[in-house]
Amino acid sequence: MKHQVQHKLLSIRRKRKQINEQPELREIIADPIQSDEFWKDLFLVRPLENVEKGKALQLAWKVFCEFESPDYAPEGTEEFKKCLNDDAYLAGIRYYGAFDEEKLVGMLGIWEEKRHVCFFFVDGEYQRLGIGKLFKRMREDFSGRTITLNSSPCGLPFYKALGFTTTDSEQTVNGIRFTPMAYK
């Protein structure tokens, strides 16, 4: 197992070195679809067990505070924190995780009944490394059905690259800025 971990770390380091030495690769990995091929087999993507949901929500909060919260009014940050601790809000969500060995590095949550993605967060060290595979896995499970989400301002280019389209203009509700989107 130790050898596998070292091999995987070397693989990730090699890929990062390749990117630094070949700037044209940046365009490939900026595209979530093409980056899947580049980073394939480095991350395990699977549905989360009930006991793993707490870690997923902790990851969501950590990443939100690091990347999203600075663009929100305090009201928006408090609203998001409230959602993470609200059992009624969290009911009916199916969670998926991306793992680097045993470490949860990405999470996606979708309300099954509404087919609405309510969470998608990736640890900062792992962003732009193909964790968008979570969407591929989720789309397989919900194939043939429209999936919706509310994108943060910084997430719009990513979701558009995955094939989501905007369905309305940007809105702010309880301090949370978002643009409604759908994937058909």
Question: Model-found features: residue ranges?
Answer:
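A short beta-loop-alpha structural element at the N-terminal edge
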Residues: F43-Q58
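Conserved beta-hairpin
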Residues: R94-G106
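A short, internal acetyl-CoA/4′-phosphopantetheine-binding micro-motif in the GNAT/acyltransferase core
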Residues: F120-Q127
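Conserved acetyl-CoA-binding loop-helix of GNAT-fold acetyltransferases
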Residues: R128-E140
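Conserved GNAT acetyl-CoA-binding A-motif
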Residues: D141-C154
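Conserved active-site alpha-helix within GNAT-family acetyltransferase domains
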Residues: P153-F178
